[in-house]
């Protein structure tokens, strides 16, 4: 990395540090004006953003439009529309005296760093940025070096909307991220893998910076044999195979009773063929996404090959096209825990099925492993649902659906332990980027 880039990073960090007194006093109107500039810039560059993302990873136009563009605009508007309510001090009373009172004040953390991922490179970087700005912070942003076209247009969006003392963006490879992590940020927000999350947390510890880590994990899906299999298949097909399975909360593997396994797989194949395929073997390029790079393609192929060697069977799919970096939607059965595919997050369009007889088997299996980012249950049996929810831990859970909880701003979104630290969306994002200050007020004599 050039010395000039290092110097620029340090210069911009110090520039933003000097703005903190003014930012702490910023009003809802001032913050809303920044967010409006942000929104206007996203709208102005909308088609360029879509084109850049599709250059980095071939995604269907409608997927990019919905997830990356509409998702970003929704996040910005949600922050704009709720600023006064979120910023207002909250009275909590006092446990010491009827003449005293306690209030909670929300103040900006300061200079924040936002490190984005490659799977949804625009929205998963810009939505946290909106929360940081709503909380009154300044920010430095870096997107993944796997999506350089998206990074280039994101830089244009940010520079058209903000002075660098408000928001700055740096582009480049891992050396740039390393230099950024050397700065004493007040808060770091990272979305990506657990392994890199550990690196980020180690860097933050040097300065005792608070962190939000949006990571991943193996999110289990459980189907009760009494549930409507067509409904489950439609929802799982979208949650698993949109973006070729490269979604942190995609169903990673499936627990299903053996007596309905083949029937479910047949229904799922029909749904998948209608939604993603040209024929039984070839994904429709206009509807299906590539794997991001050769390294990840080869990693997933290794997981698949190991599973087959150990006795797993392909129910449908299993077609790997290295020249196009596509893996056809694939379902495996006769999967066992010792297979590599059950030991790391798949992050691709392969769904392993495992059988169970009693729900306690599933609960024990989940609890013996790292806590997942999400857990899904398809059932009409409230006792079964309650049993799973009460006896497992996951970042989030959804009942009779998958993935959609991400879009519900009334819920916090985040992981637990290896699947993440902290949460955001809606008011939870505002609080994540704020210092909640308790103030004790004693009545004057």
Swiss-Prot record:
It comes from the Bacteria. Disruption phenotype: No effect on vanillin degradation. GO terms for biological process: aldehyde metabolic process. The active site is at residues 214, 248. GO terms for cellular component: cytoplasm. Coiled coil: none annotated. Keywords: NAD, Oxidoreductase. It catalyses: an aldehyde + NAD(+) + H2O = a carboxylate + NADH + 2 H(+). InterPro entries: Ald_DH/histidinol_DH, Ald_DH_C, Ald_DH_CS_CYS, Ald_DH_CS_GLU, Ald_DH_N, Aldehyde_DH_dom, Aldehyde_DH_NAD(P). The keyword Cytoplasm does not apply. Its EC number is 1.2.1.3. GO terms for molecular function: aldehyde dehydrogenase (NAD+) activity. Belongs to the aldehyde dehydrogenase family. This is Putative aldehyde dehydrogenase AldX. It comes from Bacillus subtilis (strain 168). The gene is aldX.
């Amino acid at each position: 990395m050039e010395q000039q880039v290092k110097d620029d990073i340090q210069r911009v960090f110090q520039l933003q540090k000097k703005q903190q007194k003014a930012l702490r006093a910023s009003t809802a109107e001032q913050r809303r004006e920044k967010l409006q500039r942000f929104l206007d810039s996203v709208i102005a560059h909308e088609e360029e953003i879509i084109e850049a993302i599709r250059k980095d990873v071939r995604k269907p136009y409608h997927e990019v439009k919905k997830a990356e563009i509409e998702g970003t605009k929704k996040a910005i508007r949600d922050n704009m529309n709720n600023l006064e309510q979120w910023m207002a001090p909250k009275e909590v009373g006092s446990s010491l005296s009827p003449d005293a009172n306690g209030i909670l004040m929300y103040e900006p953390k300061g200079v924040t760093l936002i490190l984005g991922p490659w799977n949804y490179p625009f929205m998963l970087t810009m939505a946290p940025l909106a929360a940081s700005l709503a909380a009154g912070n300044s920010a430095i942003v870096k997107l993944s070096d796997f999506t350089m076209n998206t990074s280039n247009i994101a830089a244009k969006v940010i520079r058209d909307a903000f002075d660098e003392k408000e928001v700055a963006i740096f582009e480049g490879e891992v050396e740039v991220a390393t230099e950024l992590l050397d700065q004493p940020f007040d808060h770091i927000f990272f979305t990506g893998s657990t392994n890199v999350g550990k690196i980020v947390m180690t860097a933050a510890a040097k300065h005792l910076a608070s962190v939000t880590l949006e990571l991943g994990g193996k999110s289990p899906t459980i189907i009760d044999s009494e549930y409507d299999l067509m409904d489950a298949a439609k929802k799982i097909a979208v949650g698993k195979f949109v973006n070729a399975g490269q979604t942190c909360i995609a169903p990673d593997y499936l627990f299903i009773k053996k007596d309905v396994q083949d029937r479910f797989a047949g229904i799922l194949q029909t749904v998948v063929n209608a939604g993603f395929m040209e024929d039984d073997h070839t994904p429709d390029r206009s509807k299906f996404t590539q794997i991001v790079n050769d390294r990840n393609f080869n990693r997933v192929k290794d997981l698949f090959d190991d599973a087959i060697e150990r006795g797993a069977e392909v129910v449908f799919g299993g077609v790997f096209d290295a020249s196009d970096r596509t893996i056809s939607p694939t379902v495996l059965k006769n999967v066992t825990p010792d297979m590599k595919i059950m030991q790391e997050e798949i992050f691709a369009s392969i769904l392993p099925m495992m059988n169970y007889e009693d729900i306690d088997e599933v609960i024990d299996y989940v609890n013996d492993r790292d806590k997942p980012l999400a857990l899904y249950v398809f059932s009409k049996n409230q006792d079964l649902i309650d049993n799973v929810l009460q006896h497992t831990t996951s970042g989030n859970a959804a009942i009779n659906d998958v993935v959609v909880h991400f879009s519900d701003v009334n819920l916090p979104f985040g992981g637990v332990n290896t699947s993440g630290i902290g949460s955001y969306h809606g008011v939870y994002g505002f609080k994540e980027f704020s210092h909640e200050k308790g103030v004790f007020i004693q009545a004057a004599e």
